[in-house]
A protein has these predicted regions:
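Active-site loop segments of alpha/beta catalytic cores
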Residues: 1-29, 93-341
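A contiguous, low-structure linker/loop signature
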Residues: 54-102, 117-125
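Short helix-loop boundary/capping segments at the starts of domains
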Residues: 19, 30-35, 63, 70
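Short conserved micro-motifs at the rims of enzyme active sites and ligand-binding pockets
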Residues: 35-37, 69, 281-282, 319
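Short, basic/low-complexity N-terminal boundary segments at the transition from targeting/disordered tails
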Residues: 24-45
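Short acidic, Pro/Gly- and aromatic-enriched capping/linker segments at domain boundaries
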Residues: 40-58
Length: 341
């Protein structure tokens, strides 16, 4: 019998099938797994991702992204130089670049080459918008951005519609050239302890925007993956209704038992672990292995679960964390490949 690729094994779960082994979903390259084909890779338009590829700088809106040791290489908006201080004046500041003269076929070909995904082994996920909530916070910062949602709903709706028109034009012109296996919707609308917005505000502002994007995937039968960190379980029902098939990183601050009981294999959970826990210097290698085994036992017995256990190492010279990462990689492989035998 032919051996499944990582892609084939992962994509089985979108059909409600139990995979041959527990897949590993990653949000980027994983140290120690450079020679292993990832289950998923991402393609995004150059104009939207150029600042990330070059490790920082200004995005298309003028927001400057920087990295730091504390962010473990992640890019975040510069927190002392926001570009918008009054949402009612967004038209004076937020200027979408023209899309009129783009050769979409050629642009998509270049994007696919740049992402370096071997589609025979790895599922391709496409994405455009990096989240409407996140984008507003990047423009204004959390204090002014959250106040704007409460104080200036008309201006916020107008800004979001403007952004949505821009992003959906890009999706409309790229999706049939990319021909992705998966479609990503990304927005971090929650902190660890609570959502940043109420369910009512989520439905008023953000759900219609996600639904508009999701329709491109629904119309083509493309599975939809939803990324939202933090305690965002209150939004999951609505996201499933618009077609979401997978949620990452499904962090443990959520009631994951209740989510799995309700949706079973209909909603794949990718993650479900506590990366802070395994950085405890008192833990042995066996403790880490046992923790990951427990996650598999709790989440994977009926399928619908994917490991997303990746440690971002802020200090390349931190031998302890380098070792922990190696232990995690080995444990996930061994546990995952033996779980359904």
């Amino acid at each position: 019998m032919a051996v499944l690729t990582e892609k084939e094994n992962f994509m089985r779960m979108f059909k409600g099938e139990i995979p041959e082994w527990i897949p590993r979903y990653t949000l980027g390259p994983v140290r120690g797994l450079e020679g292993v084909a990832p289950a998923v890779g991402v393609v995004a338009p150059e104009m939207l991702s150029a600042h990330r590829r070059r490790g920082g700088g200004k995005d298309i809106w003028g927001v400057e992204y920087i990295t730091s040791k504390e962010a473990a290489g992640g890019l975040l908006p510069k927190t002392w130089d926001f570009i918008l201080d009054d949402v009612t004046k967004w038209r004076d500041v937020i200027k979408a670049p023209s899309l009129d003269d783009i050769d979409w076929e050629m642009a998509c070909k270049k994007d696919l080459e740049a992402c370096g995904v071997d589609r025979s082994k790895t599922a391709l996920a496409s994405m455009a918008a990096s989240g409407y909530f996140q984008t507003l916070m990047a423009f204004m910062g959390f204090t002014e951005g959250l106040c704007a949602l409460y104080d200036e709903p008309e201006a916020c709706h107008e800004l979001f519609d403007y952004l949505s028109d821009f992003y959906c034009t890009i999706i409309e012109n790229t999706i049939d050239y990319y021909k992705p296996d998966l479609f990503n919707i990304v927005d971090d609308t929650a902190a660890w302890g609570n959502p940043f917005v109420s369910l009512e505000m989520f439905r008023e502002y953000f759900l219609p925007l996600y639904d508009r994007e999701a329709k491109f995937a629904r119309d083509r039968g493309i599975p939809i993956c939803y990324h939202n960190c933090g305690k965002c379980e209150i939004f999951i029902d609505d996201m499933v209704k618009i077609g979401v098939d997978s949620w990452n990183p499904a962090q443990i601050c959520n009631d994951l038992d209740a989510v799995q009981e309700k949706y079973g294999n209909k909603l794949m959970l990718c993650g479900c672990w506590d990366p802070v826990k395994i950085t405890d210097p008192k833990l042995t290698d066996e403790d880490i292995y046992d923790y990951l085994q427990k996650i598999a036992n709790d989440r994977a017995k009926n399928g619908g679960f994917c490991f997303l256990a990746t440690i971002l190492i802020p200090d390349e010279g931190d031998s302890r964390m380098l070792h922990v990462n190696d232990v995690v990689n080995k444990a996930i492989y061994e546990i995952g490949h033996n779980f359904y035998k």
